[in-house]
Amino acid sequence: PDWDMMKSIVEVHHPGIDRDLLKRSLDLFYQVRELDLRKRPSTSELIDWINVLVHEGAMVDSSTIPFVGSLLKNEEDLEKLK
C-alpha cells in the first residue's frame, strides 16, 4: 500500500495515535523498505512495531530505529541496520 493507505490502516489498528509518531514511523518504515533487504517489512510488521512504540512510549527519529526487531525479522537484515 502507498503511504496514505498505510496511514489509514495504521489508524484503524491504533485509533488516536499521536500524529507525529504516525508520520515519523511511516516515513522510517518506507525508508527501510527501500533498503536492500532479504525480507522487507510488511504491513503486519509495521502494525506490530507501532504497537511496541506506543506501549513503550518510544520516540522515532531518522538516526535510530527503536525496537527494530519488531520491524525486521531476518537476522542478516538486522545486522545491516546496526
Residue positions per predicted region:
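C-terminal regulatory/interaction module of P-loop NTP-utilizing enzymes
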Residues: 1-82
